[in-house]
Amino acid sequence: MVLSRLAASGLLLLALLALSVDGKPVQQWAQGGWPRPGPEIPPLKVQQWAQGGWPRPGPEIPPLTVQQWAQNWPHPQIPPLTVQQWAQWGRPPGPPIPPLTVQQWAQARPPHPPIPPAPLQKWAPVQKWAPLLQPHESPASGTTALREELSLGPEAASGVPSAGAEVGRSGSKAPAAPHRLSKSKGAAATSAASRPMRDLRPDGKQARQNWGRMVHHDHHAAVGGGGGGGGGGARRLKGLAKKGAAKGCFGLKVDRIGTMSGLGC
């Protein structure tokens, strides 16, 4: 019984206290009459402007570098890169400042005429080269005689037939192949320019063998002199053939003849 009476009296006191106060602390805190706990909370617009989620009223505050450059007079003519970037992207009013590269290019170069638009610019004239020579065309007639002389061999160049040309392996005389020259230099130049050097040789196998003897005259030199030289060379070749050099060519190895003269057997 006693406990129930105490509880009822406590509840009655609390109800009377609430009726006596009735919103007075809230009104006092809003009017500034109550000491606010903690730091002062800014308004909602100020918070949004500080966080960047609300369009900021008034002009945008430039960075510190821009302010220092604007207050530091006299300053260089070209502003720093940070100032240029802020002027181009930070504040839209006012004429845009050209990039740093454009400013340097405009200040370093002398006044130049305006560059015409791309459709008005013409390509440079294409240079015309001289026609190339044909693969077998001879530019001058001086090389024609040299080609004829090389194609006919050393016999035609010297005018005297070699001694080895008259003597074969057995020592018998073989008729030399006649060399026919063209009637005019123009025809010879045309034929020499159109055919390879190998096709211009009118001689046969016997003449090529004589050419090889003349190139390697030290291997085919005769012991005797005069008219007996050819016979001595033939006898020497026969002796070499009997000694086991039959696999060679005129007493020499075939590969050696091929590398030195290019003719072979």
From Swiss-Prot:
Intrachain S-S bonds: C249-C265
Primary location class: secreted
Pfam families linked to this entry: ANP
Region of interest (Disordered), ranges: 153-211
UniProt superkingdom: Eukaryota
UniProt propeptide residues: 24-26, 44-46, 64-66, 81-87, 100-106, 118-120, 126, 132-215, 235-243
Gene Ontology CC terms: cytosol; extracellular region
GO MF term (any one): hormone activity
Keywords: Cleavage on pair of basic residues, Cytoplasm, Disulfide bond, G-protein coupled receptor impairing toxin, Hypotensive agent, Metalloenzyme inhibitor, Metalloprotease inhibitor, Protease inhibitor, Pyrrolidone carboxylic acid, Secreted, Signal, Toxin, Vasoactive, Vasodilator
Entry similarity comment: In the N-terminal section; belongs to the bradykinin-potentiating peptide family. In the central section; belongs to the pHpG family.
Stated name of the protein: Bradykinin-potentiating and C-type natriuretic peptides
